[in-house]
From Swiss-Prot:
InterPro entries: MeTrfase_7, MeTrfase_capping, SAM-dependent_MTases_sf. This is Probable methyltransferase TCM_000331. The record marks 152, 224, 337 as: Involved in substrate discrimination. Binds 1 Mg(2+) ion per subunit. Disulfide bonds: none annotated. PANTHER family: S-ADENOSYL-L-METHIONINE:CARBOXYL METHYLTRANSFERASE FAMILY PROTEIN. Its cofactor is Mg(2+). It is an enzyme of class 2 (transferase).
Length: 369
């Protein structure tokens, strides 16, 4: 397998940036919020008001969503302190992690408004919140031993540490022609390669986090998952539409067929049973809660979680922009930037002809043994 970094999202605030087009990521957090809040409440009895609570958000990216999870953590602790009638609350050390290529400058420009909001809303007696950026892959060590109380990550651990592509290794997926991911037409070795790489990566992730967390520390992870046991039966198939648009460019002579055949998106959507099995086998964490949630894919219907009828071309363009926000850097690296506008124009047309569909997410809460 060829090594590849976990992809970064589009930075900045342009129309196709992650900050502008991360609506599915924005709507899944409120659905995961009850589990995150319950996890914090379970932690509360073991936390002193004189402690400094160390919280890490892994794969934070940049944009409006960056501080959403941290805000829930801070708000819930504040609520618990008020209920316990504590005169003071803990201080917070927040670590925002992503790859070095992430737009950390955008994050840092938002820190002051985040901390000002906390101070204004909760008063001077509420513990200070210190924010630090931590560049690096979460498939390596990021923090000292036994230093973290709480780890959160949303839609990040799906990204694989390596691309499951090889034309020389028998179990690679060099024969996944016509696709950019797992599809019904993909041969069995494609599914096996993705599944095996995810198991290896997630096991490594759990092992490393267990070293960095205090005994009894908590971790809440949200995955883009699947509701079907069989990997080829994906709940969302924007990747299928992206493949169609890409191979249209092959037919037009804009993209070489060999280049298209050698591109695969390095991600994996697990089934809930796979997550349980990996967590139990790695054995650093007790599985506390696991919940499968569904969200709509679309522009405004994602925001309201209701099924509205929209102009299909607007919906198609919005969906294409959302896909571009998370895939453009890797596509540009593989094909160059010249094909991107035409590629995503084609994707928008394919998406415009589709009916709305649901995305499956899996929220997991764990406790460090």
């Amino acid at each position: 397998m060829v090594k590849a970094s976990v992809p970064c999202m589009n930075s900045g605030d342009k129309e196709t940036s992650y900050g502008t087009c991360s609506l599915p990521q924005e709507i899944v957090l409120p659905k995961a919020r009850p589990i995150l809040e319950d996890t914090i409440k379970d932690m509360f009895s073991n936390v002193s008001s004189t402690d400094c609570i160390k919280v890490a958000d892994l794969g934070c990216s940049s944009g409006p969503n960056t501080f959403m999870a941290i805000s829930i953590v801070v708000d819930t602790f504040h609520e618990m302190c008020q209920q316990a009638q504590l005169k003071t609350s803990p201080e917070f050390q927040v670590f925002l992690n992503d790859l070095p290529e992430n737009d950390f400058n955008n994050i840092f420009r938002s820190v002051a408004s985040f901390t000002d909001r906390i101070k204004k809303g909760k008063g001077d007696k509420f513990g200070l919140c210190f924010v630090t950026g931590v560049p690096g892959s979460f498939y390596g060590r990021l923090f000292p031993n036994r230093s973290l109380h709480l780890v959160h990550s949303s839609y990040s651990v799906n990204w694989l540490s390596k691309a499951c592509i090889s034309f020389h290794v028998p179990d690679g997926i060099g024969n996944n022609k016509g696709s950019v991911y797992m599809a019904e037409s993909s041969p069995p070795n494609v599914f096996k390669a993705h599944s095996r790489q995810f198991k290896e990566d997630f096991s490594t992730f759990l092992k490393l986090r267990s070293q960095e967390m205090i005994p009894g520390g908590r971790m809440v992870l949200t995955f883009n998952g699947r509701s079907n046991l069989y990997p080829s039966k994906q709940d969302d198939d924007w990747k299928l539409q992206l493949a169609k648009s890409l191979y249209d460019l092959v037919v037009e002579g804009i993209v070489k067929e060999a280049d298209a055949d050698s591109f695969n998106i390095p991600m994996y959507a697990p089934y809930k049973g796979e997550l349980c099995e990996i967590i139990q086998k790695e054995d650093s964490f007790d599985l506390d809660k696991l919940e499968v949630v569904q969200i709509n894919w679309g522009p405004r219907d994602v925001l309201t979680n209701e099924d509205f009828e929209f102009d299909k071309y607007q919906r198609g363009q919005k969906t294409a922009n959302s896909v571009r926000a998370i895939t453009e850097p890797m596509l540009a690296s593989h094909f160059g930037e010249d094909i991107l506008d035409k590629l995503f124009t084609g994707l928008a047309k394919y998406e415009a002809e589709r009916l709305g569909y649901k995305l499956t997410s899996i929220v997991v809460s764990m406790k460090k043994k």
